[in-house]
């Protein structure tokens, strides 16, 4: 595979690290699927747009839980600048365990998620990226349900201070 051209990201953020971003993307992906399984949407609004959450939750019929998210591959496939934002498209291949109507099943997933952040925002230190906390003050506490930091009150939405999932253009999930 040819590595994605990350010039659009690095031109506005010289501190960008693809491995650290990939860890962050996997953390968001796993947490989002676990919350999908629990039927909990609100906390996801700190890391995902409502459209992305709607797409993620589209197949919740009879779903009781999601667990054991295992990554087979995570690839940054494209980066671009558009409308004052930097976008990174990530392809995930994973399997996870779903419980639907009392039946536990392994599910193979192939998905593309588009992460976005305001152009010019600098990457926080790796430990801040991996905490899903506040990019502003460094608090490792997760945002309140209204998207604000419990330590400093900064808003953690809209890709203004940290990456968010702006869209899920492709999601294919099937039983193994």
Residue map of PLM features:
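Generic secondary-structure microfeatures
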Residues: 48-51, 92-96, 119
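A short, surface-exposed beta-strand/turn
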Residues: 101-124
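Surface-exposed, charged secondary-structure patches
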Residues: 63-105
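Short, intrinsically disordered, charge-biased short linear motifs at domain edges
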Residues: 118-125, 133-140
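Short metal-coordination and nucleic-acid-contact micro-motifs, chiefly zinc-binding Cys/His arrays
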Residues: 127-131, 144-145
């Amino acid at each position: 595979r040819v590595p994605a051209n990350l010039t659009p990201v690095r031109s506005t953020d010289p501190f960008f690290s693809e491995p650290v971003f990939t860890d962050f993307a996997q953390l968001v992906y796993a947490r989002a699927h676990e919350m999908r399984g629990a039927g909990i949407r609100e906390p996801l609004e700190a890391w995902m747009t409502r459209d992305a959450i709607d797409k993620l939750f589209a197949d919740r019929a009879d779903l009781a839980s999601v667990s054991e998210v295992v990554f087979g591959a995570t690839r940054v496939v494209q980066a671009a600048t558009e409308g004052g934002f930097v976008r990174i498209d990530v392809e995930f291949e994973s399997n996870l365990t779903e419980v639907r109507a009392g039946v536990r099943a392994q599910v193979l997933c192939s998905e593309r998620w588009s992460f976005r952040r305001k152009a010019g925002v600098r990457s926080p230190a790796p430990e801040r990226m991996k905490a899903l906390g506040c990019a502003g003050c460094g608090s490792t506490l997760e945002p309140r349900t209204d998207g604000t930091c419990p330590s400093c009150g900064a808003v953690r939405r809209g890709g203004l201070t940290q990456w968010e999932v702006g869209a899920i253009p492709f999601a294919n999930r099937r039983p193994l």
